[in-house]
Amino acid sequence: TIKVCVSECGNNKKYKFDQSAYTNMSDVGTSYGIVYPGASGDANKATIQYHTPELPFATTVAVAFSTTSADGSSGNAGGTTANGDSMNEYSLTSAPIDGLTLHAQVYDFNAYADGVTTNDQSEEGGGYAATYALGNATVGYGKSFKAPAILEGVRSAGATTVEYYENTGMSIGYAVNDDLSVSYTQETSEPNYMTSATVGYDVEMDSIQLAYSLGGATLSIARADVENVGYVQNTDLTETIIAMSFAF
C-alpha cells in the first residue's frame, strides 16, 4: 500500500507500551517537558509511505520519506533553512505469538545544506516496545531515543548541550470486569550531555488511572505525579484529569 499524507499517517512507537485505562498523561494536559523522537506523521511534514502486505508472524513493515511543508519547500518566498530538511523512516509491527506484540521505529534526518551552517550531529531517533496480554491483564515495556540536531558551532558548549535523550516506559492495565479497568504507568526520560561530567536530572512520571462504564457513558479518572519537569531539579507537579465520555 502506498500512502501520501500531510501531518498524519504517523508511525511513531513512543507510546506503544502504554496500557493506560484513559490516556497517555505525558501527551495531554500540562507539558512535562519530555523530549520524544519525531515521526513521519508529525505536523507540517508531507510524507510518502510504502506499507507491506502482512508478512509471516503478522508482521508489517513501513518505509517513509518525509519533508517539511513550509515555504522553504515550495515556490514561494523562502522560509527558514530547516524547511529543506527531509527524513527517512522505517517501522515494524509484529505479533509472533498469541498475546505478544512488538513495535519498532527508526528515523534519521537529511539536513538541508544552506552553505552557512554545519551540523555536527543531524537529528535521528526511534523507539521499540513490547506488549503481552494474558487473561485480563496486559503489560507493556518500551524505550525511545532522540538525538537532536547539533550545530558545529555549539559543540564547544558540551556542558549544556544534550547529545541524546533516552526514554523508558512501563505500564500494566487490568480489566477488573466488563465495566471497570485500572492501570499503572511509569515513564522516565534521561538527558545525556555531550560532556559526561554534566549532572542531568531525569523527568519521572507515575500515573494511576481507572475507567468505569456506565452504560452509554464512561467515567475516567487519571492522576500523574511528575518530578523534575523539563529536566529541572525539584520542579515537580501533580495533575488530575476527570473525564466523562458519551456514546450516542
Where on the chain are the PLM-derived regions?
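Outer-membrane beta-barrel proteins
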Residues: T1-F248
